[in-house]
Amino acid sequence: MILKNISLLIILFFSISTFSAGHSLKNISITVVAPATGADNKTLSDLKNINGLNLQISSKCFAKGKLPFLASSDEVRFNCLRDALFDESDNIVWSLRGGYGSARIIPDLLKLSKPNKEKFFIGYSDITALHLFLSQEWGWKTIHGSNIADLLKPEQDQGNFTKLAEILKGKVKQVTIDNLVPLNDIAKSSDLVNGKLTGGNLTMVQTSIGTSWQIKTKGKILFLEDVNVVPFRLDRELLHLKQAGLLEDVKAIIFGSFGKDLDATMLVLRNFADSLDIPVFKTNRFGHEKINDPIIYNTNSKIIKSKEFKLVMGV
């Protein structure tokens, strides 16, 4: 009886959370794309059945190809993304989930001319590759934020979607990331840092090095996050960015979550921060954990200090 009641409470919590997020996105037409890993039919059906959501999900974009970890073949994923980006009837393109595969279709994206209409493009994790392309090649202000399938995850803070909805509906002129903790002395003594934002998932940022879509960091505020990263791997990837010269002209670095923030992970981040002559901060307000506040690429932003440090972005 107790187990049954617990199960009912879990189902009720999930239903309320999903309804709340769905309500904040009510009447917003959203084109869902799967440029990386896909989802099973139940996941797609559950998304379509969330009350108030207006999701455009094309079944042809989920025809499995040879590789089971991709939503479909490279050709199909590219075509579906291209069609969504160029369709002038919708304003929002939202990635289903991350996983793997976005980098595989960038060579074809590079052959395209920039569309006449700029759209909201949302996603994170593996989708970082597309953020770098769209912000650097087309000059778009894309949004690093929860993938649409995260609506079905009860462990996710549904406030992530409320904040995204406020941006999409034009209700806010700026968004903020609070609780920036300075990791080195330069950060502690900083009062103001100005710059546009770039970055995203550390693994994907590292993957971009040496490619046609390599991250451009000069004069930018760099934000980085990842998931389940063991300390030595984290140190190795950060060292790669440094030795590749990508941190030489960075205005500041903001680290998001990297898992459970074990003591060893924080030791790596603090040690790395001390090796740099730029401000470095840490927050748990974005990444693969419960809270994933939106961050806007390519927009005028600033790190300011009042009672605490915070990142303020224009919309």
From Swiss-Prot:
Q: Name one GO molecular function term.
A: carboxypeptidase activity
Record's superkingdom? Bacteria
Spell out the catalytic residues: 125, 225, 288
Which Pfam families does this chain map to?
Answer: Peptidase_S66, Peptidase_S66C
Please name the CDD domains in this protein's record: Peptidase_S66
GO biological process: any one?
proteolysis
Q: Does the keyword Iron apply?
A: no
EC class name: hydrolase
Known EC number: 3.4.16.-
What keywords were assigned to this record? Carboxypeptidase, Hydrolase, Protease, Serine protease
Give me the disulphide-bonded residues: none
Keyword match Transcription regulation: no
As for family, the record states:
Belongs to the peptidase S66 family.
What protein name does the entry list?
A: Putative carboxypeptidase RC0549
